[in-house]
Amino acid sequence: QSEEVFLVHVRDRIIPLRRDAIAYLYTANEKVTACTFEGEVYPMDRTLEAYQSQLPEHDFFRANRQFIVARRAVKEIAVWFGSRLTLHLAVNTPERIVISKARVPEFKAWLRAVRPAE
């Protein structure tokens, strides 16, 4: 079951973060952050694995150990060394997003997939 809205705790406030506003989720130093299409960055309180299970697979892809990316955020794909791919998103990212050679076919199939009827 995927969540439509995540409640994000920022200091003494709780901010409702809509799933469709998320461009990517990123983990570094055991902390997960979400970046919106407007470039806002929010601290999240679960692991990347937990969010992966809460986000619809059709709309979000686990690119690597650090990133889950939204389909709408992918603007360009570049072929990189060793048959890997790098993703360029609609928003800036803290580091290069690399898709491993082994995951390239899965990523391409995901990107080509037609949205299932709801």
PLM region descriptions:
Residues 1-98:
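Conserved binding/recognition cores within well-folded domains
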Residues 1-11, 101-118:
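Eukaryotic intrinsically disordered, low-complexity regulatory linkers and tails enriched in Ser/Thr/Pro
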